[in-house]
Amino acid sequence: MIPVKEHAHTLCFPLLVAPRSSKNMVVGAHDNALKIKITAPPVDGRANEMCVAFLSRLLGIPKTSITIAAGAASKRKEVCLALSPNAAGKQEAARIKALLAGY
């Protein structure tokens, strides 16, 4: 199970990234983190950019709402998602938590 921390209008969870993979994909829960594979190399921030773009498509939220809070130069990262402060944001948080719980 992937631990999700909820702060004021923010969800954070651990992410394990495997760069230079043959395709972008979710591997699943691994070592208390969501493990993903991405095709970009870990050079000049390209892996982080692709990681954010992949999570944006996976979670259905804008790239601007996703930040790498910790581990920008590491395979193990802490990703935070900024959500709107209204009821729609709470529904979005519940949807994302349910999606992550499925891994």
Curated annotation (Swiss-Prot):
Stored Pfam families: DUF167
Transmembrane regions: none
Database matches in InterPro entries: DUF167, YggU-like_sf
UniProt signal peptide: none
SUPFAM superfamilies for the chain: YggU-like
GO CC terms of this entry: cytoplasm
Taxonomic superkingdom: Bacteria
Similarity section: Belongs to the UPF0235 family.
Name of this protein: UPF0235 protein Dole_0289
